[in-house]
Structures are given as structure tokens and as C-alpha cells.
Amino acid sequence: MPRIDDAALHEAALAHLARFSATEAGLRRVLSNRIRRWARAAGQAGQDPEAIAAEVARATAAAAAVAARMVRAGAVDDAAFAAARARRLRGAGRSGRATLAHLAQKGVAAELAAAALQGEEVPDEFHACLVACRRRRIGPFAAAAPGPDTRRKWLGTLARAGFGGEVARRALDTPRAEAEARLA
């Protein structure tokens, strides 16, 4: 079974970045998965476990170096990734909390994620809450006026989506025409 050399890792990184935007941590994870698959195949091919472990350690260090090289080259930019993803998620009705959690899961540093949420082009929390209401057909976008139990369920739905109580109440109380105008 051939070794995983730096060139193969570099090519794998380029192939991934050609198809997907990624963070440095995400790229390291992709390369790590490739190394893990190689190690599993090498073990099944009957290679010495000690030799496999040594190769995995060397390839893991090389993967970190490849990811760092991609950052230096500008192919990976965590701040740009965070800004674009925050804009997309908030525009789709995700709360600030849900967006921060998503960015953290993707490997974006907390300060970069917070800065991305403050960007000019990122919709505010109220706008995102109205989008969530429209997607779920609740609040101003409901077919009928809610009873007290229904309103409580809607508040619970928005709370589970990460919206604060004040923002959720304000969105649910917004008249339909005003909500549609805000989203237009």
C-alpha cells in the first residue's frame, strides 16, 4: 500500500476546496478522515500496525501543515467563511445562538463568529425570527388567529430555535402586512 505523501494531501485539500468552502479546522478534519481511511485499508492489507501508526502520525502532522499552507495562500479564510455562512443562516431564519453554534461546530473561533454576526449584510435577530415564523407558518403568517395554547406552542417553537422571548413575542405580535414588508 503506498504511503500518504504531502503531495497527495495537498491534492486532496485542493480537490475539497474546489467543491466546498471550508475552515482550517474543517479542512484538517477532511484530511484526517482521509488518513484514517488509508490506515484502515493498510491494516486490512496486512501492513505492520507499528508502521501504520508511524505513518499516521507523520501524515497527521503533514495534514496540519497543508491546512496552514492553504490559509497562508488565501484558499482558506475562516473570517470570510463565517461571514458568508452567518449571512446565509440568518437569512434562512436561524437565530444568533443557532448560528454561533453552527459556526463553532464548523471550527470557527468564537470571536470570528461573533464578528460575523455583527456584519452589515447579516440580517438582525428580529428579521431572522420573522423568516422562521414564515417558514413554520406561525405568528403573522398563520392561517388563523391563535388561541392561548397555540401561542404558547409557537413561543416554545421559537425558543427551541434559539430566539429570545422578547424577540419571539415581538415577531408573533407583528401584523402580517408589516412582517411581509420587513421581509421584502
Predicted regions and their residues:
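An alpha-helical, amphipathic repeat domain used for nucleic-acid recognition
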Residues: M1-A184
